[in-house]
Amino acid sequence: MLFRSEGDRQGLAGVVHATCLDGLYLVPSDRNLVAADFELYGMENREFRLKALLDQVRDQFEYIVMDCPPALTLLTINAMAAADSLLVPIQCEYLSLEGISALIEAMDRVRAGLNPKLELEGILLTMFDERTTLTKQVAAELRSHFPEKVFETVIPRNVRLAEAPSHGQPVLLYDVRSKGAEAYIQLAKELMKRVVT
């Protein structure tokens, strides 16, 4: 999308799609996004390509949410250069602790060189299983290092959350009464309190 929209001059507005939910729009990607990092390396202003596209439509939306891969790729750097803040989902696993350290370092570099307004909105614990010692340890470690940033809401391991994408639906449409859907509703409430205050 980053490159197709530039090539045919339709801009980002030409690839924004309405959904069945009022006020929710998507810009879909596909498997060709894998090659985007390679293409970006040869471009001028490569860290600001996504920001330039978002600036075309930013005033048309109250919030723009970008879902990024967990790897620190040039696409992720583009998202950080364009973002106001980051919401970082962390699986409750040991290696996630190392990953958050690398992400915070990258965020600091982006803030220093590309986007001084970038903030850490919060850290979201996912794949949370309160029955395991590891989950409790990871949660405690993150809460001790980032006391104001870890959301109270946690996203549990949940079968319905895992099933929903295979049915082409968000969990709130697939099974709104599931524990996973309830957790995301609670997260939205907690996030809005943070954003509004």
Q: What label would you give each PLM region?
A:
Residues 1-197:
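P-loop NTP-binding core
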